[in-house]
Amino acid sequence: QYVKDGGTLVVTFKSGFANENVKVHVDAQPHILKNALGISYNQFTFPRDVKLAGKLYGEARVFMELLKPEGAEVLAGYEHYNWKGYAAITRNKYGKGTAYYLGCMTDDATLQNVIKDALGSAGVELSGYSYPVIVRKGTNDLGKTIRYFLNYSGSEQAVTYKYGDAEDVITGKEIKAGTELKIPAWDVRIIEA
């Protein structure tokens, strides 16, 4: 229902495989999630040197399900002579929402790409900044956007402020797009727009 009502859901392999008593469902997997995900499977294997290919590229690791799309868009399939006819990662529009399914353990870069796509589908703004500077966003009681630039390192960090005109809440100084923000070690800059 969550996806049908407009939610974005990311599901990984073995989800919906068994009930709360660990009894494996005997029908097509992933049982109760099958319609929302737009896929089914009834076979799995353990990959050895299996690459992923399609809109996403990467590597299948540890475990892989042999997915059969039933309306879902295939983002990646298995690049392997035995498994090339099966999907590995899918995206499905269901009702007003979107559901993603990862039928295998992937490499980190592939997983990040799926998560970025899902966040975009959910309307989540990605900051474009990365560790050790993490940005969090909220709205204050006046309806203004507040961004917290958190430095999670023992050395000063400098980032370029890429949003519209704003003010540093602590210093009261005006901040314009393109301004270099220096964030002391283990500190924060709070910017209000």
Protein language model regions, located:
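A conserved amphipathic helix/loop scaffold
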Residues: 1-193
